[in-house]
Structures are given as C-alpha cells and as structure tokens.
Design a protein with these regions (language model features):
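Structural recognition of the beta-strand scaffold that forms the well-ordered cores
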Residues: 41-42, 58-62, 103-106, 124-125
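Stable alpha-helical elements in mature extracytoplasmic
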Residues: 47-50, 91, 109-113, 135
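Short coil/turn segments
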Residues: 62-65, 106-109, 128-133
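Proline-aspartate-enriched helix->loop->beta-strand connector
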Residues: 92-94, 99-104, 122
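A short, structured surface patch at a secondary-structure boundary
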Residues: 45-94
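Bacterial Sec-exported substrate-binding components of ABC uptake systems
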Residues: 2-46
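Extracytoplasmic substrate-binding proteins
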Residues: 30, 112-135
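Short, flexible loop segments at the rims of nucleotide/cofactor-binding pockets, characterized by
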Residues: 20, 36-38, 79-85, 101-103
C-alpha cells in the first residue's frame, strides 16, 4: 500500500510540475489543481511517509500532537512542520492558518470533515486507514 501511495504522489507531482493544470482522480471523484502544490497538509502519518520518500515536505501533519509518532528516519528527513492535531480529529483552525494549497486526507477517517476541508483548500482523498498491503 505504501509503495502505491508513493507511486501516486510521485506521478501526481511529475504531472503537475510540467503542466499548467492537472486533473486528479481520488476516492471522491476528480478535481483540478491549477498549479503544483507547495503547501501541503497531510492528515495521516502514512501520507507524510510517502511524501518524504519523494522529497516533498508537508507544512502540516496530523501527528496526534506527538512528533515521535512519525518514524525516526522520516522525521529526520522532514523539516519542522506544524502539528494540525490528531488524525481522528484534525484542527480545522490550525489547517486553515497554514494556508495550504492541498490537503491529503483519508477517505474513510476524514469523510465527516471533507466539506469543511474543501472550504480551506483542494482535498485529495486516499485510502490509508483499514487498508492492507495488498490494497
């Protein structure tokens, strides 16, 4: 699963770095990114891992208010980030304050705040929680 997420992020960044706009399909449907995201907030630790693997550093992470929840080797690779609360209950105020241009959320865990997140920035909904490695 993590390999697929890394592949997806790498492909997404490759496509939008060479084009003016890119249409992205996720678990909720499709949306268009007008430019390459520079200020990304992730609401799952696996998404932070995947971004770090392709040298993309999120500005905000739902790290459960504990930086040690992120794997040490990933934490060493990331610049200081702003905690945006817990994965189960991310802080919409903290996310909005960071002025992200993309939020990456879990399609199951964050379904209840999806509309509120969309008011802040485009939201990429991916599967992370309750997934197996085969998926």
């Amino acid at each position: 699963m993590l390999a697929f997420i890394r592949f997806l992020f790498a492909g997404l960044l490759l496509v939008i770095s060479h084009a003016f706009a890119a249409t992205v399909q996720d678990e909720h449907g499709t949306f268009t990114l007008e430019k390459t995201p520079q200020r990304i907030v992730v609401l799952e630790l696996s998404f932070a891992d995947a971004l770090a693997a392709v040298d993309v550093i999120p500005i905000g992470i739902a790290d459960d208010n504990d930086a040690k929840r992120i794997l040490p080797e990933v934490r060493a690779h990331l610049k200081p980030w702003q905690s945006v609360g817990t994965r189960a209950q991310p802080s919409l105020e903290a996310i909005a304050a960071l002025k992200p241009d993309l939020i990456i959320a879990d399609s199951s865990r964050h379904a209840g705040v999806y509309i509120a997140l969309q008011q802040i920035a485009p939201v990429l909904l991916l599967k992370s929680r309750n997934e197996t490695y085969a998926e």
